[in-house]
Amino acid sequence: MILVTGISGGLGGLIFRGLSGEDGLGVAGGTRSGDDAVDGLEVDGLEVVGGTRSGDGVTARRIDFDDPASLADGFRGVDVLVFVSAGYAEDDVVLARHGAVVDAAEAAGVRHVVYTSLASSGSLMTIALPHRWTEARLADASFDVTILRNGLYAEIPVGLATAAASSAAETGVFAAAFGAGRVSVVAKQDLADVAVRVAAEIQRDLAQGRRSRHAGKTYELEGVEAIGGQDIADVLSDALDRRVGYHPISLSTTRAALAGSGLEPYQIAHTISLLSNLNAGYLQARDTDLTTLLPTRPRRVRDQIVQAVEEGGYRSPSVNSRSVTTGA
């Protein structure tokens, strides 16, 4: 059986859905509450183990990293654990969570853990520390391990572009603290597709009585496409049908803006760290295993930006007025 943690989140949910479409696999999903996080999943013909906080649910096991006692039952009978990292907290909290997962997986007799880590290009970012610590902790464990070093999500620049689209349509300016740097990004769905392939192949290898072909492997899943501030401005120009220029802003200006955004202090620190690395030119990938493991061509971030902006209905004032007067 395969269990995927964090299925109420974006990546975990995509992985769980993908595995649930694989023939001949037993798949269980885990959430903090064990409630209705996976309502509507298509899992015909598969064994899907359910559980809730009260133990009488039908859709997901309760997996709460902040409640280590819940993990022993949650991991019961699991062969392959897809361990989606839980990084939305201060480092000490993340280390405690991840350590509890490793301990519980060993105690439950899990045979193979697949961990979603951070790509090498991000090793100087503040978010890298808990990932590298977890990799080291997993290396000392009794089960086999596969590390999926995920690149930064394409959804980050897509979200920035979408948030800036209205202003860019009015002013013709996209402002961001990217400097002259570019960042390699990868669509979350592409990362999920790789995780599905790896976890499914591991489960099938184990079912045939052999050690998995992925045991002991670390895969760099860096994006094949790098994007910078000028690139985003150019895509906005196409999507908005008006010229948009890129205006770099300082990290100090960005930090001040984030201070009033409602983000937690650790989130601000991680954001500034990402932008600092981007400015320094450290976030462009040199090598990637993505194209080897992905069954299709990687999704293009430029296409995602255009789609998001068009779906948002953003257009420059001149385009909107032209549409009204011509009936287009």
Regions flagged by a language model, labelled:
Residues G26-R32, G45-R53:
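Short, hydrophobic beta-strand segments that form beta-sheet elements in well-ordered domains
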Residues A72, G99-V102, K188-V196, V301-V306:
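Short, amphipathic alpha-helical "lid/cap" segments that border enzyme active or binding sites
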Residues D289-A328:
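Amphipathic terminal alpha-helices
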Residues M1-A28, R32, D36-D39, D66-A69, ...:
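Oxidoreductase cofactor-interface core, primarily capturing Rossmann-like NAD(P)-dependent enzymes
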Residues T52-D67:
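Rossmann-fold cofactor-recognition segment
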Residues A233-A280, P317-A328:
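Terminal hydrophobic/aromatic helix or amphipathic segment near a protein terminus
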Residues F75, D79-V82, V114:
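N-terminal Rossmann-like NAD(P) cofactor-binding module of classical short-chain dehydrogenase/reductase
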Residues A195-A199, L236, L275, Q304-V309:
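Hydrophobic "lid"/C-terminal helical patch
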